[in-house]
């Protein structure tokens, strides 16, 4: 099993670019930069896309330009066009249930209230069995404050921790293709930015 599509979840537009909810897109942007494969808008996939080679494998990158709760439209369009199965997809997203400075790989599971994941599961035929990269953004402590929190911009001190976790996650994702998922997971899950 290899990953053929890496997706970074986000809301479109300048007003959302620096918000916590866009952490998944920050990850794919960094990966595209590291692999010198600039993302370009591609209307038929409802997002910015690029094609990279990782460990000799042909991999597509995608940042949907739909709103977060319609992310599945872009993912399903690309998966269908390139005949990519759910278990060949890695979706990077912001994760309230992980602390700042931490990122973790996970296969399958629920959506945990994340509207992007919810729509992807639905558009993949109610199939939750895709890989996720959960990027810790911390939790505001009160569930009534969650919407404002994820759509807010982290202060510089928090942004630094998120960026460091994303940087390590990019290295570990590349490692996944060369050394396997177990090794990459062990390294990523041992990391915590200080």
From Swiss-Prot:
Task: Give the principal location in a single coarse category.
Answer: cytoplasm
Q: Which InterPro entries match?
A: Pept_tRNA_hydro (IPR001328), Pept_tRNA_hydro_CS (IPR018171), Pept_tRNA_hydro_sf (IPR036416)
Q: Which residues form a coiled coil?
A: none
Residues flagged as site, Stabilizes the basic form of H active site to accept a proton: 94
What family does the entry list? Belongs to the PTH family.
Identify the GO cellular component terms for this protein. cytoplasm
Q: What is its EC number?
A: 3.1.1.29
Q: Which gene encodes it?
A: pth
Which PROSITE patterns does the UniProt entry name for this protein? PEPT_TRNA_HYDROL_1, PEPT_TRNA_HYDROL_2
Reaction(s) catalysed by this chain's protein: an N-acyl-L-alpha-aminoacyl-tRNA + H2O = an N-acyl-L-amino acid + a tRNA + H(+)
| Active site residues of this protein | 21
Q: What are the residue positions of the site described as Discriminates between blocked and unblocked aminoacyl-tRNA?
A: 11
Please state where this protein is localized: Cytoplasm
GO terms, molecular function = peptidyl-tRNA hydrolase activity; tRNA binding
The first-level EC class reads hydrolase
Question: Taxonomically, what lineage is the organism?
Answer: Bacteria, Pseudomonadati, Pseudomonadota, Gammaproteobacteria, Enterobacterales
List residues binding tRNA: 16, 67, 69, 115
Domain of life of the source: Bacteria
Q: Name one GO biological process term.
A: protein quality control for misfolded or incompletely synthesized proteins
Function of the protein: Hydrolyzes ribosome-free peptidyl-tRNAs (with 1 or more amino acids incorporated), which drop off the ribosome during protein synthesis, or as a result of ribosome stalling. Catalyzes the release of premature peptidyl moieties from peptidyl-tRNA molecules trapped in stalled 50S ribosomal subunits, and thus maintains levels of free tRNAs and 50S ribosomes.
Pfam families registered for this protein in UniProt: Pept_tRNA_hydro
Q: How does it assemble?
A: Monomer.
Keywords for this protein: Cytoplasm, Hydrolase, RNA-binding, tRNA-binding
The name of this protein is Peptidyl-tRNA hydrolase
């Amino acid at each position: 099993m290899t990953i053929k599509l890496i997706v970074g979840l986000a809301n479109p537009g300048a007003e959302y670019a620096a918000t916590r909810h866009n952490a998944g897109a920050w990850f794919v942007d960094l990966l595209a930069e590291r692999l010198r494969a600039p993302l370009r808008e591609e209307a038929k996939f409802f997002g910015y896309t690029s094609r990279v080679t990782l460990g000799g494998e042909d991999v597509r990158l995608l940042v949907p330009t739909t709103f977060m709760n319609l992310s599945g439209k872009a993912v399903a369009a690309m998966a269908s066009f390139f005949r990519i199965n759910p278990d060949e997809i890695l979706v990077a997203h912001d994760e309230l249930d992980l602390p700042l400075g931490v990122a973790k790989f996970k296969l399958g599971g629920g959506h945990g209230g994340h509207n992007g994941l919810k729509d992807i599961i639905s558009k993949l035929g109610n199939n939750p069995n895709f890989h996720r990269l959960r990027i810790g953004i911390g939790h505001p402590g009160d569930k009534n404050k969650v919407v404002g929190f994820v759509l807010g911009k982290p202060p510089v001190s928090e942004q630094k921790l998120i960026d460091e976790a994303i940087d390590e996650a990019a290295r570990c994702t590349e490692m996944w293709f060369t050394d396997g998922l177990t090794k990459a997971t062990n390294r990523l899950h041992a990391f915590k930015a200080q």
